[in-house]
C-alpha cells in the first residue's frame, strides 16, 4: 500500500488546498498520472501518482487545507481486486440433485457476503464517513446523487433528516444565514479561493508592516513611440517578437536600480540585504488576480530577450501553467495598470521588495514646449511606491527622474543593449 503525501513545494509554502481530485477511489492509475490539483498561495500544482495501482482511499476532500508531508490518500499495488475463482463443477450425476437443493441457501449466503463486502467498499468522502460514524449510519444504505456514486456529507445529512428534528439542519449553514440576515436585498455568498485569500492577507500585511509611500512623475512617450514606429518591422524580422513598451521600462528600471541600489534591497530582521542581481517581477492579470512572474537577470537580456521572456511568462500565467520557481525571488516589480485604462494609481509593494513601479495609460495632453508654444504629446503618469524605512524621498524621486530621462531619450537604453 503506497501513501499519497503532499510533497514539498517551496520554502515559503507549508500548506495548500485541494482544488479537485482528478481520480476517484477505485480508479486504476499509472505511475506519473495526475491524481489531484492542489491550490497553493501562488499557483495550482497537479500531483502525480508515484507508482501504479488502484486509488484505494481519499482521506481529504476538495476544499480541505492540507500540510506539506500530510497523507491525503492511499494507492494499492496491482490492478485492483480480482473476482474469486469460480467453484469447480462436479461431474457426478448423483450429486446434481443435492447441489440443486443447496443452490438457494448458497445463493443467500453469497448475497449476504456480497452485501458485507459492498458495505466495506462503499465509496464515500472523509467528511461523510466521519458523520456516518457519529450518527451510527450504514453508508451502504445511503443513496447519493453523485454521478460517480460517491457518498457525500450532504447525502448522509439528507438520509438522516427524516428521523431527526430540523434544528441540527439549520446549524449547517450559519455563515450563509448570517450573511443573508445582514442585508435586506438579495445577496450571493461566495467562498474566496485560497489564492484570493492569500492576496488579501498579504496586501493588508504590507500596509501594516511597511512605511509605504508613493511619488509620481510623468513621461513624454514621444521618443519611445517614434523609435518603435521606425524599428518595429525590422525588430520583428530579426527577433520574431514584437517590440513593446515593457522592454523599455524594464531596461530603464535596471539602470535606475544600479544608480539607486537601496530600491533593490529588502529588510531581514535588523539587517538590510542589498541585492546585486536584477530579477524583475512583471505583474500579469490572471483569472484569480494578479500574479508576478519574474524575468531573471534582466540586466543581461537584450530588448528581444526581455520581450520573449515576458511573452512566455504572460502566456503561462493566462493558462495557469506558471511554476513556483517562476514566481519567486524577484527584487523589484513593474505593474501596468494602463492596460486596463488606469490613468493614475498607487501600487502596493510586493513584499519583501521595497519598490514597485506603476505604469499607466498613455494619453494625449497639451504640453508647454516653450513660453509661446503648446503641443499635444503622448504622456504617461508613472508612480513609484517604496518603503520609507529604507528609501528616503530624495532617492525615490531621483529613481523616478532617472526612469523619466531614460524613456524620453531611449537611445541611452540602446547603448546598454
Curated annotation (Swiss-Prot):
This protein's UniProt keywords: Acyltransferase, Lipoyl, Transferase, Tricarboxylic acid cycle
Name of the protein this chain belongs to: Dihydrolipoyllysine-residue succinyltransferase component of 2-oxoglutarate dehydrogenase complex
Organism whose genome encodes this protein: Bacillus subtilis (strain 168)
Function, as annotated: E2 component of the 2-oxoglutarate dehydrogenase (OGDH) complex which catalyzes the second step in the conversion of 2-oxoglutarate to succinyl-CoA and CO(2).
Pathway terms, separated by semicolons: Amino-acid degradation; L-lysine degradation via saccharopine pathway; glutaryl-CoA from L-lysine: step 6/6
GO terms, biological process: L-lysine catabolic process to acetyl-CoA via saccharopine; tricarboxylic acid cycle
Biased composition regions of type Basic and acidic residues, renumbered to the chain: 89-103, 152-163
Summary of subunit composition and partner proteins: Forms a 24-polypeptide structural core with octahedral symmetry. Part of the 2-oxoglutarate dehydrogenase (OGDH) complex composed of E1 (2-oxoglutarate dehydrogenase), E2 (dihydrolipoamide succinyltransferase) and E3 (dihydrolipoamide dehydrogenase); the complex contains multiple copies of the three enzymatic components (E1, E2 and E3).
InterPro entries referenced in this protein's UniProt entry, alphabetically: 2-oxoA_DH_lipoyl-BS, 2-oxoacid_dehydrogenase, 2-oxoacid_DH_actylTfrase, Biotin_lipoyl, CAT-like_dom_sf, E3-bd_dom_sf, PSBD, Single_hybrid_motif
Listed PANTHER family: DIHYDROLIPOYLLYSINE-RESIDUE SUCCINYLTRANSFERASE COMPONENT OF 2-OXOGLUTARATE DEHYDROGENASE COMPLEX, MITOCHONDRIAL (PTHR43416:SF5), DIHYDROLIPOYLLYSINE-RESIDUE SUCCINYLTRANSFERASE COMPONENT OF 2-OXOGLUTARATE DEHYDROGENASE COMPLEX, MITOCHONDRIAL-RELATED (PTHR43416)
Bias-annotated ranges (Low complexity): 164-182
Cofactor binding note of this UniProt entry: Binds 1 lipoyl cofactor covalently.
Modified residues (N6-lipoyllysine): 42
Sequence segments annotated as region (Disordered): 75-191
GO annotation, cellular component aspect: cytosol; oxoglutarate dehydrogenase complex
Gene Ontology molecular function terms on file: dihydrolipoyllysine-residue succinyltransferase activity
Domain Peripheral subunit-binding (PSBD): from-to ranges: 123-160
Gene name in the database record: odhB
Cofactor(s) named in the record: (R)-lipoate
Family: Belongs to the 2-oxoacid dehydrogenase family.
Domain Lipoyl-binding: 1-76
